[in-house]
A protein has these predicted regions:
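Loop-to-transmembrane helix boundary motifs in multi-pass membrane proteins
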Residues: 147-149, 184-187, 303, 363, ...
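Selective recognition of specific alpha-helical transmembrane segments in multi-pass small-molecule
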Residues: 112-117, 121, 266-270, 295-323, ...
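Membrane-interface "cap" regions at the ends of multi-pass membrane proteins
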Residues: 40-92, 146-147, 151, 257, ...
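Flexible loop linkers connecting adjacent transmembrane helices
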Residues: 56-61, 95-100, 123-148, 173, ...
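Hydrophobic alpha-helical segments and their helix-loop junctions in multi-pass secondary transporters
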Residues: 194, 216-248, 255-258, 262-276, ...
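Transmembrane alpha-helical segments of multi-pass small-molecule transport proteins
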Residues: 153-157, 178-200, 217-222, 235, ...
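Juxtamembrane transmembrane-helix boundary signature
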Residues: 83, 110-143, 152-158, 162, ...
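Extracellular/periplasmic helix-exit of transmembrane alpha-helices
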Residues: 119-131, 278-288, 306-348
């Protein structure tokens, strides 16, 4: 110790506002003191017993910076892959199929725009988790007034329930298509997917990521075969490029469907989930390692959501190749299936792919991909539910209980409506779930952007100008589109409820 006074060093404490430490009479150099303070800052919330997904927290070791780029990338790869499944769930299928069938490649640019916006928003969500040690639900609990916890949690649960509704219906349709199980009973069977979750519990984060990776690979391979192997569906890359880089909404109905695509692509529960999943990585608690973690999570997000974009684009392309320009198709036996803007495109796709493409394999691949989509979304939906419940309310229940409750809340209304209205209600229910998600999305995006743009909350890791402009621009655009589409959304919801 010396009598020389050292400068004041201030670092934002992880999980708190600003920690100011005065280093009077300290012999250490200011830079060394700053690094020590940063280590305390970054570890500040690691000992918090209220962290979400506690059994997965810091469960995957990350090699040090002396190791190769690829080894570190493999260690960080995974959280965004789990998140990406939300961008190719059954809710997306309905809007993507309708876009390709009605406008060919005309709305591919909207799919690309939605994917880019989603990519930036998810990068920001991952940044929050790495830099503060909090997921978005915990941040809202700690940094907003106490009275906001209940409404925030209930709105999140509504969004997760809506997501689960689309997943259940997608899986039910796939079971119906593959095994000819009546839709009513197929929906009931989806309640037992809790067995899938039970089989994964205790396996660890890496194995869960591997299982979801298999599902994602299944979806990708199925569409790859349908697009590039079957001779009847060879796309025109020149037309696709023209549609991507010369955007327009000049045709009637394009704007409404574009709103639906954006609403179905960016999922509010994914923001909570991603900010929690990135904390499954255990890395050194120093400034350089945090910078490294942010970099590799950004790469992980960009890679996984680019894959999700190609899957969504493939669905649009398949629908464009098979359905665009046609008004109906005649099935074996003489049954005529008409094509209209309000058609149940998921059902139509399975019924008509085989006769239109000349092979039964086309319909089977479609159904297998749909089932993989629904089941993988089940895993991530349950994890997201745990994150918001533990983050907002600090309630902990077994994941299988969480799964059963969420699925029952989703399928009981679906069973009732299908029982009363029949199979024609499937698409209406899926579309209704996407409406609920679109309306809840700004309520998740705005806190995320507020926190991550604040130096008080994030310190040196706050969003740069590029992320701030992109994030806030996306939030404003989505909010405006939500307001524009609200009357139609409420009308659609009323029609589903009343059976009109």
């Amino acid at each position: 110790m010396t009598g020389e006074e050292q400068p004041v060093v201030a670092m934002p404490e992880r999980g708190q506002d600003v920690l100011q430490i005065h280093t009077r009479h300290c012999a250490a150099k200011p830079e060394k003191v700053r690094q020590e303070i940063f280590s305390l800052y970054i570890a500040g919330s690691m000992n918090d017993s209220n962290r979400s997904l506690e059994n997965m927290h810091s469960s995957v070791a990350v090699p040090g910076q002396h190791t190769s780029f690829w080894r570190r990338w493999r260690a960080f790869f995974g959280p965004a892959l789990l998140v990406s499944i939300g961008y190719m769930d059954p809710g997306n299928w309905s809007t993507d199929l309708a876009a390709g069938a009605q406008f060919k490649y005309g709305l591919l640019w909207v799919v690309a725009l939605a994917s880019v916006m989603a990519m930036f928003i998810q990068i920001i969500a991952a940044r929050l988790g790495v830099a503060t040690g909090k997921d978005l639900a915990q941040a809202c609990r700690d940094w907003y007034p106490k009275w906001t916890r209940w409404p925030n949690w209930l709105l999140c649960e509504l969004a997760i329930g809506s997501t689960d509704l689309a997943e259940a219906l997608g899986s039910a349709v796939a079971l119906n298509l593959l095994f000819h199980i009546p839709l009513f009973w197929a929906v009931v069977i989806t309640a037992f997917d809790v067995l899938l979750l039970l089989s994964l519990e205790g396996l660890g984060m890496r194995k869960i990521e591997a299982v979801v990776g298999v599902f994602v690979a299944t979806i990708t391979v199925c569409y790859g075969i349908e697009i590039f192997v079957l001779p009847q569906t060879q796309p025109s890359f020149a037309e696709m490029g023209h549609a991507l880089f010369q955007p327009s909404l000049h045709q009637p109905g394009m704007l409404v469907l574009a709103i639906g695509i954006i609403g179905a692509t960016i999922m509010p529960h994914n923001l909570y989930l991603h900010s929690a999943l990135v904390q499954s990585r255990k890395f050194q608690q120093d400034e350089a390692s945090v910078r490294d973690a942010i970099k590799f999570n950004t790469i992980d997000t960009a890679t996984s959501l680019t894959l999700a974009f190609f899957v969504n684009a493939a669905i649009v392309v398949l629908a464009a190749m098979v359905f665009f320009g046609k008004t109906s198709v005649t099935l074996t036996g003489g049954t005529v299936v008409p094509f209209t803007p309000d058609s149940d495109w998921i059902q139509i796709a399975h019924l008509t792919l085989a006769p239109l493409l000349g092979t039964a394999m086309a319909s089977t691949l479609f159904a297998v991909a749909l089932l993989a989509s629904g089941q993988s979304s089940t895993i991530t939906g349950t994890l997201a539910g745990q994150v918001v419940m533990e983050g907002f309310m600090r309630w902990r229940i077994p994941s299988w209980v969480r799964r059963v409750v969420t699925r029952l809340l989703a399928i009981v209304p679906a069973i009732i409506i299908i029982g009363v209205r029949g199979n024609r209600s499937i698409t209406d229910l899926i579309n209704l779930s996407q409406v609920v998600l679109a309306l809840q999305l700004p309520l998740a995006m705005l806190p995320l952007l507020q926190f991550t743009s604040s130096r008080k909350r994030m310190g040196q890791w706050r969003n740069g100008w590029g992320l701030m402009v992109t994030g806030w621009g996306s939030a404003i655009l989505i909010t405006v589109l939500d307001i524009y589409g609200l009357p139609d959304a409420l009308k659609q919801a009323w029609n589903v409820i009343t059976g009109k």
